[in-house]
Amino acid sequence: MAFLNEQQRSEMLANGAARARGDIVDPLPVLKLHTLDAHATWLLAELAEDGDTAYGLIDLGLGMPELGHVRLSDLASIVGPNGIPVRVDPHFKAQRTLSAYAADAARDGSIND
């Protein structure tokens, strides 16, 4: 998938494998995707064995961010109202765990990072 480099893919697959084994995990998000013209953001931390299903914090800009699964192939097909596709935030460096981002987003009604 064009969103991930090999290091990110490996890290997200390892996080996904840990959860699949039943390990209790609360990883740092590995990847931030967003739309520049539609106020949607995804902080992704895990990738399933299929290499397409990711898990993380999803904020569709509706004031109700939540943890969940999303297919990278679906994200690759999304464009905002001005025709701008979903993009990787190249400057994103996780500062806290996924659950901490989720708690802050639930309180604030959006991902603010």
Descriptions of predicted regions:
Residues 1-38, 110-113:
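N-terminal domain-onset segments
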Residues 7, 36, 47, 75-78, ...:
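Low-complexity, intrinsically disordered/propeptide-like segments
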Residues 30, 41, 55:
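Conserved beta-strand and immediately adjacent loop positions that scaffold enzyme active sites
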Residues 38-39, 52:
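Short acidic/glycine-enriched loop/turn segments that link adjacent beta-strands
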Residues 44-81:
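Acidic, aromatic-enriched beta-alpha/helix-loop junctions
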Residues 66-113:
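Helix-rich interaction surfaces within compact, conserved domain-sized segments
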